[in-house]
Amino acid sequence: MLLVIDVGNSNIVLGIYDGELLVRHWRISTDKSRTSDEYGVMLNSLFSLASLSFSQVKAIIISSVVPPLTGVLESLCRDFFALPPYVVGPGIKTGMQIQYDNPREVGADRVVNAVAGFEKHRSPLIIVDFGTATTFDYVNSKGEYCGGAIAPGLAISLEALFQRASKLPRVDICRPPHAIAKNTVNSMQAGIFYGYVGLVDGIVERIKLESRDQPRVLATGGLAALIAPESKTIDEVDEFLTLEGLRILYERNR
């Protein structure tokens, strides 16, 4: 079995693949203060609840946008699984040309998503990943990663509104019933939610215009299922796109 680990700023998503089949997946909070032993104990509990054992894992691949945790998780892999993990970054064969001023600047998660998206669809794509930041990535018909845009995530935007406007409360992220809201909480939710839908559609349309193409638009990430139904541009939600990309990269580098 293959263990794939996607380390984001807010969450770590883990998956277990048996061949091409994703058999289990988990989402835990990202905590830079945890040690490799603490993550190991947590992972042992998750494995036990799923009737899995560490000995069943024969390979591990990690994508991380949190550098302090990369080494911690590498230690976890060596100490608990006795395996050196593959880490997405320089030296990993992606099979994709990166059309970027400095390819090393492209986040590992963005490359992983691009690889998975093109492998599955074999057509031009825009991939919208709703994470701590929301990323927009364009892959052309040749399968080349062409760049994209980065915007503040939905949660960051909502938290900034609470922090910087002293009379406004902290509210949950949800789809409000109306854009013309009748109370402060719904007004904030309407502004953030519908404003963010407009941001997504606006950036996607601009990328389409600049690309002179009609790419398929994939959405992934924790809040994709919330935003996609209101979006005019998102064609499909792929919840496990990043995990699938890690599996594909493992196959290309094993």
Curated annotation (Swiss-Prot):
Zinc-finger in keyword set: no
Binding site for substrate: Y100, G107, A108, D109, R110, T184
Cofactors demanded by this protein: NH4(+); K(+)
Residue sites binding ATP per the record: D6, V7, G8, N9, S10, N11, I12, V13, T132
GO BP: coenzyme A biosynthetic process
Cellular component, GO, one term: cytoplasm
Cofactor binding comment, as recorded: A monovalent cation. Ammonium or potassium.
InterPro entries tied to this protein: ATPase_NBD, Type_III_PanK
UniProt GO MF annotations: ATP binding; metal ion binding; pantothenate kinase activity
Alphabetical list of Gene3D superfamilies matching this protein: 3.30.420.40
Catalytic residues in the record: D109 (proton acceptor)
Enzyme class name: transferase
The keyword Transferase appears for this protein: yes
A Pfam family: Pan_kinase
UniProt-annotated location(s): Cytoplasm
Family: Belongs to the type III pantothenate kinase family.
HAMAP family recorded: Pantothen_kinase_3
Protein name as it appears in the record: Type III pantothenate kinase
